């Protein structure tokens, strides 16, 4: 446990002033300077947007970028009133899960893997793209190809991580398509929980009841949900294990 999955240059710390227009956040640096950072998470970020909260940002040296800062993490209080850092950059989720697969941390569930491909067209009309398409090694007793959809998960109630935190038509469609892959292929939904305080995972029924129903239907049909938890630090992210459903 606590394997380092990704390392990066130390992030820049500041304080959240406000988040607006979905993609933007004003952040005060430790020097007192206020900068505008890009926010890759376009969702409501339920339970996270507290003005005055500590945040961390990466900075790009590219002169082509209009906004050099990218908002990466925010510090919130967990159910025990203790600080926990939450990864809010949704673009990180697939990077984390690919690393986890490459490090064989999911082998007990998916078996040994021969190849990993990203963004592969699938579905009846081939207009959808699956996050990861895996082929098993010949030693893998399950010879079926593996389709993996990844969902970034930040919302918490108590010690339970929840997805989604708002109505998601796209997420509903993904569940239907994952179900249709069964039994010819192995169908997996990975919940990338970007905070260390989750003990369980449940679908976010309060935010999207239909998603919850589709989740349970797909699960009953053979879809495999894997809630993967991570711990976020100033210069790295560690593996925090697979959490059970609740």
UniProtKB/Swiss-Prot annotation:
Similarity annotation: Belongs to the SfsA family.
Name this protein carries in UniProt: Sugar fermentation stimulation protein homolog
A single MF term (Gene Ontology): DNA binding
Record-linked HAMAP family: SfsA
Entry-linked InterPro entries: SfsA (IPR005224), SfsA_C (IPR040452), SfsA_N (IPR041465)
Transmembrane segments: none
